[in-house]
């Protein structure tokens, strides 16, 4: 009796191959879509002056850093920009912090402004850590009076930094739970980016969440979910009526700055 050596077709195996191929294809698509959504450098619209310095990364890339000191005992804000924001666009907010007596620092991601290279999630984390350590080492900043303020994608950078360093305060403005969940309404696709909700339990400092009620890019539900994820209950939350994704500080005005002052200093005045 001869045995048929041909393999028996297994529909289940074929189905699994199709499913795996579909997941891989969708993961690649999601990654590309997310990258295009996250990183949109604007044209350079300003000239560097003595307020700007360069911090050199390990691979030789010069990070364009802004620093203005207010005094040794002042609180320091390290501002992490949004996806379409260079230092010139962030300057009104930075100047407001200066007027309120803060040391102010920020930097441009790779591919933004006067920083060369191309941005990705990994090098944003590494570069932010370099600037953070530079402030402690070269500017004499104390972590006990250091505030991380991240807007939009910068909130993801600030959250990661707060898990690996020990800042005194964390402010997240217009920030998402994760990129895939916000952009694609999916959490199961592998390779998600800026998974802030999953990192919340690792943040040990007080947190202030700020969100515009009319944000059509990152819905305010993201900040509501983040509030529930931070442990210990040391979380403040400000929603700004009629504010969208990019104008929360302008629409919020006095209420916005009062909330920040109360959160950082315990002061009752935003002026």
Specify the residue positions occupied by each region the protein language model found.
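Short alpha-helix in the alpha/beta-hydrolase fold that links the catalytic acid
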Residues: 93, 196, 205, 219-228, ...
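Alpha/beta-hydrolase fold nucleophile elbow
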Residues: 140-152
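Acidic catalytic loop of the alpha/beta-hydrolase fold
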Residues: 214-218, 246-247
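C-terminal catalytic histidine-bearing segment of alpha/beta-hydrolase fold enzymes
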Residues: 224-225, 232-271
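Membrane-embedded segments
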Residues: 62-134, 156
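Active-site nucleophile loop of the alpha/beta-hydrolase fold
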Residues: 167, 171-181
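Short beta-strand/loop motif that positions the catalytic acidic residue
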Residues: 203-204, 209-211, 215
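An N-terminal hydrophobic leader/cap segment in hydrolases
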Residues: 11-57, 64
């Amino acid at each position: 009796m001869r045995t048929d050596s041909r393999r028996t077709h297994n529909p289940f195996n074929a189905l699994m191959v199709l499913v795996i191929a579909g997941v891989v294809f969708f993961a690649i698509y999601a990654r590309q879509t997310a990258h295009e959504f996250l990183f949109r450098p604007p044209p350079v619209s300003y000239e560097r002056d003595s307020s700007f310095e360069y911090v050199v990364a390990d691979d030789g890339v010069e990070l364009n850093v802004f620093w203005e000191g207010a005094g040794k005992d002042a609180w320091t804000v390290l501002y992490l920009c949004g996806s379409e924001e260079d230092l010139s666009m962030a300057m009104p907010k930075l100047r407001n912090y200066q007027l309120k007596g803060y040391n102010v620092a920020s930097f441009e991601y790779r591919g933004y402004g006067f920083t060369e290279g191309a941005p990705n999630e990994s090098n944003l984390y590494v570069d932010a850590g370099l600037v953070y350590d530079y402030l402690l080492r070269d500017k004499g900043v104390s972590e006990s009076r250091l505030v991380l303020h991240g807007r939009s994608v910068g909130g993801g950078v600030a959250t990661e930094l707060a898990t690996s360093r020990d800042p005194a305060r964390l402010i997240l403005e217009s920030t998402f739970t994760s990129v895939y969940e916000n952009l694609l309404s999916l959490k199961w696709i592998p390779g998600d980016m800026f998974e802030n909700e999953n990192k919340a339990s690792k943040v040990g400092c007080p947190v202030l969440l700020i969100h515009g009620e009319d944000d059509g890019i990152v819905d305010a539900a993201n900040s509501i979910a983040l509030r529930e994820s931070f442990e210990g209950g040391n979380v403040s939350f400000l929603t700004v009526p009629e504010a969208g994704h990019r104008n929360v500080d302008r629409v919020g005005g006095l209420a916005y700055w009062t909330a920040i002052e109360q959160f950082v200093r315990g002061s009752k005045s935003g002026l």
